[in-house]
């Protein structure tokens, strides 16, 4: 069985990354929110009462990436050099893709996953009035398949 690097003697701790090489790191994560067709059309046409859903979700994702160490206890504060947030609008869903780049000593996959999660939660928050049923619940709204698409580590070469 593989050992967890952040657990020692049944106690969680932050892994020491000070001896790791500084390299360029990328991670891309993706996830989807399922919505009513009518809600997706309102997002597409810009007809959501709370405002521009995707612009707000993009901003929320970027802020979430930068705040990941405040939310996930064992994440290191690392220099984020780039965040790119893209959305794909389907018939009854919206997919969020977040790519994070850093030059540092540890990966950025948790930052990318956090960005996707908060983007999708923001979309839900902005359209929840259109998604509720007559009891105030969300029987068909769902966030799904949040996962890392790719993680890359590149050696820095002096030019």
Swiss-Prot record:
One GO biological process term: Mo-molybdopterin cofactor biosynthetic process
Family: Belongs to the MoaC family.
Keyword NAD: no
Gene3D superfamilies: Molybdopterin cofactor biosynthesis C (MoaC) domain
Swiss-Prot/TrEMBL catalytic activity: (8S)-3',8-cyclo-7,8-dihydroguanosine 5'-triphosphate = cyclic pyranopterin phosphate + diphosphate
UniProt name for this protein: Probable cyclic pyranopterin monophosphate synthase
CDD domains per the UniProt record, alphabetical: MoaC_A (cd01419)
Subunit structure as annotated in this protein's UniProt entry: Homohexamer; trimer of dimers.
Function field: Catalyzes the conversion of (8S)-3',8-cyclo-7,8-dihydroguanosine 5'-triphosphate to cyclic pyranopterin monophosphate (cPMP).
Keywords (A to Z) from UniProt: Lyase, Molybdenum cofactor biosynthesis
InterPro entries (alphabetical): Mo_CF_biosynth-C_arc, MoaC, MoaC_sf, MoCo_biosynth_MoaA/MoaC, Mopterin_CF_biosynth-C_dom
Active site (catalytic residues): 125
TM ranges: none
Pathway per the UniProt entry: Cofactor biosynthesis; molybdopterin biosynthesis
Gene source species: Methanococcoides burtonii (strain DSM 6242 / NBRC 107633 / OCM 468 / ACE-M)
Entry-linked NCBIfam families: moaC (TIGR00581), PRK09364.1 (NF006870), PRK12343.1 (NF008999)
């Amino acid at each position: 069985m593989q050992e967890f690097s952040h657990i020692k003697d049944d106690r969680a701790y932050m892994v020491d990354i000070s001896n790791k090489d500084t390299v360029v790191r990328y991670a891309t994560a993706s996830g989807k929110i399922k919505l009513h067709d009518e809600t997706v059309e309102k997002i597409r046409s810009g007809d959501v009462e709370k405002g521009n859903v995707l612009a707000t979700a993009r901003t929320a994702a970027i802020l979430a990436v930068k705040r990941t160490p405040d939310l996930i206890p064992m994440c290191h504060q690392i220099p984020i050099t780039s965040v790119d947030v893209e959305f794909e609008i389907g018939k009854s869903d919206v997919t969020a893709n977040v790519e994070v780049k850093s030059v540092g000593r540890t990966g950025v996959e948790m930052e990318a996953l956090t960005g996707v999660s908060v983007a999708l939660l923001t979309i839900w928050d902005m359209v929840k009035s259109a998604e509720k049923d007559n009891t105030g619940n969300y029987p068909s709204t769902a966030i799904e398949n949040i996962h890392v698409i790719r993680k890359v580590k590149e050696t820095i070469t002096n030019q």
